[in-house]
Amino acid sequence: MSVSRRDVLKFAAATPGVLGLGVVASSLRAAPASAGSLGTLLDYAAGVIPASQIRAAGAVGAIRYVSDRRPGGAWMLGKPIQLSEARDLSGNGLKIVSCYQYGKGSTADWLGGASAGVQHARRGSELHAAAGGPTSAPIYASIDDNPSYEQYKNQIVPYLRSWESVIGHQRTGVYANSKTIDWAVNDGLGSYFWQHNWGSPKGYTHPAAHLHQVEIDKRKVGGVGVDVNQILKPQFGQWA
């Protein structure tokens, strides 16, 4: 049986103190760093972390979900970001980046192709605006998989084109592994890229990536499991 990293987070939320003993973060200095990193962002779904604790951990902001909790995702107490949280982060000088992911695995958003892209882009745009996100800021659409080229061409391309049709090319970000980022760049899809390492060559960072997720499920901040991301370009989709 395969267990995804999000299943691990779900287990951690249900069994506090069992997972992550000894990895509660007071500093992110031990996290891997991409060459040329301009700072660290956290991403998380299992709760809401006060700005003061994010700053104390050494991060400059957070990548936050503008998507609903999926069925069975009651543990995702941090989805979607709310206006009060966004005000806490921005009011304390922290950066916010919006990302969207509703389904996963067999229910992954991109599997629905073009029609799903329209649906999810509209919902992401609504939740982004409700949290105070400006109409100029991008939203990273998630390809949280290691897809084949056939899947990319037949489902991911129409999915991302639909995102662009709803929020615009300049506002469409892509969260994906390095090969999917490469395909998207070659096809002129997306303006911002956030790399994850599932299916990416070890130690490789795509030159087009604005952000790189370098650590998952290894630490907590404020009692919430976090992933660690390195900022690679001065403009990475931040809106606060």
Swiss-Prot record:
GO molecular function: lysozyme activity
Temperature dependence comment: Optimum temperature is 38 degrees Celsius for the hydrolysis of p-nitrophenyl butyrate.
Keyword terms, alphabetized: Cell wall biogenesis/degradation, Glycosidase, Hydrolase, Secreted, Signal
Source taxon at top rank: Bacteria
Reaction it catalyzes: Hydrolysis of (1->4)-beta-linkages between N-acetylmuramic acid and N-acetyl-D-glucosamine residues in a peptidoglycan and between N-acetyl-D-glucosamine residues in chitodextrins
Enzyme class: hydrolase
Name this polypeptide is given: Putative peptidoglycan hydrolase Rv2525c
The organism of origin for this protein: Mycobacterium tuberculosis (strain ATCC 25618 / H37Rv)
